[in-house]
């Protein structure tokens, strides 16, 4: 039996680092020999620590995810003996509307460490955790913290996935999977928590992709333990057997992802389910066995098993071709913007005129004024220049970057042809893959699928992970001033963006089968013939990639040789890699020195841009600049404007999204944070919303309301020092509390709550030039 005190200490360390660490990082915090620590984690079991092994070019990387069997009681009033924690989950996450002084009004307990809760934590050997660490552990272990799951969700591959009005705002995932009691390896309901739509709902409920990934890996582990490899074959009388054509779930599009389970789980490891092993036998013989040798176990008796599938096993003939091509357009709400080739391989050999037509159709029609529609009060229509801008160049090299490579219309032509072929070639039918970042047709057209789903040429930026577990990556390169435009393409290429959502932590991986055959000449000389191993990296939600990340880098010489040997192939492999992170890894601030007189640092870690703000959208695997940033910024600076319409696409400043795709705003540091170097610092104004839906600046008077004893400068200063705090203040005889985390102002006496927003002061490009010249 593992020592309870040591296990509690290890859990405490893991939760202090986001709930997940590599074994090497954990060894740096605990003075134990590696063999002893690994044995302790194995002895504690997968109900305490989920052990994952990630294969990459540098070898095997082992990581540990903290979990627990402790649960929060779901009853509002529990009168019977209960072994669950009794607390307010929103308060645990810092999001309860009731402030600490009004906690008696909440129907759930705010006393996290009450005598009863402490005894329960002690029974689960968690008594040493503080509130923040306990919150981290429970969020990724207890399904009670997930958003509501749709009760009428019927599964994928049906004409109607659920009976709710569309779009459904609930999670379309298997509820039994989240609880660890799903008995179906080929479950009709999705096991993919990393699906784009699922992630969008998760973010709206405060769960970052990093946390969701941890939940995915824990659920994968439970599912694999409940359904060991010996029970893969589905019973023919249950759900109609495992017919290969019965399911069209998007999260089964690519199946060749690995799960490296704890040796306690399975001595043979676990691969993805294969409904029809015999049908793939011939194809598997074509796959090189050398790849499997890279996933050697360390200190165990196990070997991780690869299940690669060549293009012959992908089901590329007949109706399945057309079905694979058409499945991506299930949601097709962007069909009016992008033209997609739905024909077979012969039609993909388009003439130059057809290719030019298609490239022209790819460009988004921006800036066309919409007429005949009544303007909503909170919507501002911003004129954008037409289409995209060509020739975006990366300034900085990174593991997932392409230094000095420009996207051109010709590149996109090849990319589109490759996409069409891949849709027809690489779709294994009815293969259950959990934790996959999926895509749909319109995503592929608009953002080259925001969360991917295309083949992964496992380069330095791809990941290998358990049972389909995959990770979103984000490398934030600087973009040259000449390419400050746009969604970043001319009539052919979409640029990229990431959300203000913070993100991911820790290694996870994915190795996908690469088709050995192509259906068009264009693909045949560009597709790699065998999957490469991959590395992983992870950054904390706080944006500090070092401490909480394990980054297996590739030397510049190797990366350069790959690019120079076949730059087009390298470009396509880079673009088609769907594993990117939606966190704040990379530059988070704009360099004021660059704005003023030029930055003298040779390796500046801040973004060099000609404006003190920078609006970007995540496309492919990089952040790309919007075209008319001043118009977006001017609208954002007005607290009354919540939406900007770009033709039929809207930017939502509350959710920081363009349609459902994330956006972000980089800026210079706050004026209150760095007042001594404040020439180009961002000045923030704080507003509260009155009963007439008018935003009133703090410190200003409004009809029927006395001005408060605080102003924007005071609020900003307090916010910079304590961004999750609660600030008490007074306006006349009324006393209030302002919650920075919830951006809510609460009247202590009447309990009335008001919405609070924080917006910058608008600075135009002319203002920047004037400040740069100085006073005349």
Swiss-Prot record:
Lineage top rank: taxon: Eukaryota
Motif Nuclear localization signal positions after renumbering to this chain: 69-76, 405-406
Motif position, Nuclear export signal: 284-291
Low complexity composition bias: residue spans: 344-353, 523-546
InterPro entries, per the entry: ARTD-AVP (IPR051712), WH-like_DNA-bd_sf (IPR036388), WWE_dom (IPR004170), WWE_dom_sf (IPR037197), ZAP_HTH (IPR041360), Znf-CCCH_8 (IPR040954), Znf_CCCH (IPR000571)
Impact when changing residue 88 to R: Results in a non-functional protein with a dominant negative phenotype
Modifications the protein undergoes after translation, according to the UniProt entry: Phosphorylation at Ser-274 is essential for sequential phosphorylation of Ser-270, Ser-266, Ser-262 and Ser-257 by GSK3-beta. Phosphorylation by GSK3-beta enhances its antiviral activity.
Bias type Polar residues, positions: 318-327, 459-483
Region (Disordered): 221-249, 308-355, 457-483, 512-562
Function recorded in the entry: Antiviral protein which inhibits the replication of viruses by recruiting the cellular RNA degradation machineries to degrade the viral mRNAs. Binds to a ZAP-responsive element (ZRE) present in the target viral mRNA, recruits cellular poly(A)-specific ribonuclease PARN to remove the poly(A) tail, and the 3'-5' exoribonuclease complex exosome to degrade the RNA body from the 3'-end. It also recruits the decapping complex DCP1-DCP2 through RNA helicase p72 (DDX17) to remove the cap structure of the viral mRNA to initiate its degradation from the 5'-end.
UniProt-listed PANTHER family: POLY [ADP-RIBOSE] POLYMERASE, ZINC FINGER CCCH-TYPE ANTIVIRAL PROTEIN 1
Protein name stated in the entry: Zinc finger CCCH-type antiviral protein 1
UniProt organism field: Rattus norvegicus (Rat)
């Amino acid at each position: 039996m593992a020592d309870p005190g040591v296990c509690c200490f290890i859990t405490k360390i893991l939760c202090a680092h986001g709930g997940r660490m590599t074994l090497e990082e954990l060894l740096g915090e605990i003075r134990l020999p590696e063999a002893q620590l690994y044995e302790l984690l194995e002895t504690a079991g997968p109900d305490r620590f989920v052990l994952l092994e990630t294969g990459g070019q540098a070898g095997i990387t082992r990581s540990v995810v903290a979990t627990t069997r402790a649960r929060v009681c779901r009853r509002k009033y529990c009168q019977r003996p209960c072994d669950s924690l009794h607390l307010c989950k929103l308060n645990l996450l810092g999001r309860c509307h009731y402030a600490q002084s009004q906690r008696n009004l909440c129907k759930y307990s705010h006393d996290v460490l009450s005598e009863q809760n402490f005894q329960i934590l002690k029974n689960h050997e968690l008594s040493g955790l503080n509130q923040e660490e306990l919150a981290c552990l429970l969020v990724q272990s207890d399904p009670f913290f997930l958003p509501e799951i749709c009760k009428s969700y019927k599964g994928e591959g049906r004409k109607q996935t659920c009976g709710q009005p569309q779009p459904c705002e609930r999670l379309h995932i298997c509820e039994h999977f989240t609880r660890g009691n799903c008995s179906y390896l080929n479950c009709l309901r999705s096991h993919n928590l990393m699906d784009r739509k699922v992630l969008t709902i998760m973010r709206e409920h405060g769960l970052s992709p990093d946390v969701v990934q941890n939940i995915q890996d824990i659920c994968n582990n439970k599912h694999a333990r409940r359904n060991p490899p010996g029970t893969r074959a589905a019973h023919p009388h249950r759900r109609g057997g495992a017919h290969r054509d019965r399911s069209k779930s998007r999260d089964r599009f690519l199946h060749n992802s690995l799960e490296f389970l704890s040796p306690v789980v399975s001595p043979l490891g676990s691969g993805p389910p294969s409904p029809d092993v015999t049908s793939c036998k011939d194809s598997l013989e074509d796959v090189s066995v050398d790849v499997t040798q890279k996933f050697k176990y360390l200190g165990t008796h196990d070997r991780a098993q690869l299940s690669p599938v060549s293009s012959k096993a992908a089901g590329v003939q007949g109706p399945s071709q057309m079905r694979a091509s058409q499945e991506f357009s299930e949601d097709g709400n962007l069909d009016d913007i992008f033209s997609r080739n739905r024909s077979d391989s012969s039609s993909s050999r388009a003439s130059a005129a057809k290719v030019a037509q298609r490239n022209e159709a790819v460009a988004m029609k921006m800036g066309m004024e919409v007429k005949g529609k009544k303007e909503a009060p909170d919507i501002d229509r911003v004129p954008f220049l037409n289409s995209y801008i060509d020739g975006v160049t990366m300034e900085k090299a990174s593991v997932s970057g392409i230094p000095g490579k420009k996207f051109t219309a010709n590149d996109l032509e090849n990319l589109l042809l490759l996409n069409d072929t891949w849709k027809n070639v690489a779709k294994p039918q009815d293969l259950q893959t959990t934790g996959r970042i999926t895509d749909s047709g319109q995503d592929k057209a608009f953002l080259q699928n925001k969360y991917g789903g295309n083949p992964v040429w496992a380069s330095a930026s791809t990941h290998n992970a358990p049972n389909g577990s995959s990770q979103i990556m984000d490398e934030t390169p600087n973009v040259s001033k000449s390419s400050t435009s746009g969604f970043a393409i001319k009539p052919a290429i979409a640029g990229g963006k990431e959300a203000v959502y913070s993100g991911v932590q820790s290694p996870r991986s994915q190795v996908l089968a690469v088709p050995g055959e192509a259906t068009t000449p264009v693909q045949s000389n560009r597709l790699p013939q065998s999957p490469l191993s991959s590395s992983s990296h992870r950054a904390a939600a706080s944006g500090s990639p070092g401490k909480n990340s394990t980054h297996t880098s590739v030397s510049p010489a190797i990366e350069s040789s790959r690019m120079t040997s076949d730059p087009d192939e390298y470009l396509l492999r880079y673009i088609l890699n769907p594993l990117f992170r939606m966190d704040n890894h990379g530059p988070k601030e704009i360099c004021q020195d660059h704005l003023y007189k030029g930055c003298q640092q040779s390796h500046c870690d801040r973004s060099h841009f000609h404006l003190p703000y920078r609006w970007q959208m995540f496309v492919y695997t990089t952040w790309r600049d919007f075209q008319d940033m001043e118009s977006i910024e001017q609208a954002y600076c007005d607290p009354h404007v919540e939406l900007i319409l770009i033709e039929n696409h809207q930017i939502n400043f509350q959710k920081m999204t363009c349609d459902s795709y994330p956006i972000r705003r980089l800026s210079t540091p706050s004026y209150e944070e760095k007042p001594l170097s404040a020439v180009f610092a961002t000045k923030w104004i704080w507003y509260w919303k009155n009963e007439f839906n008018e935003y009133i600046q703090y410190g200003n008077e409004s009809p029927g309301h006395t001005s408060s004893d605080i102003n924007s400068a005071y609020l900003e200063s307090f916010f910079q020092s304590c961004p999750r705090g609660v600030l008490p203040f007074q306006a006349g005889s009324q006393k209030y509390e302002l919650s920075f985390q919830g951006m809510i102002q609460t009247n202590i006496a009447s309990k009335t709550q008001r919405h609070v927003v924080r917006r910058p002061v608008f600075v135009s490009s002319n203002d920047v030039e004037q400040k740069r010249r100085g006073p005349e």
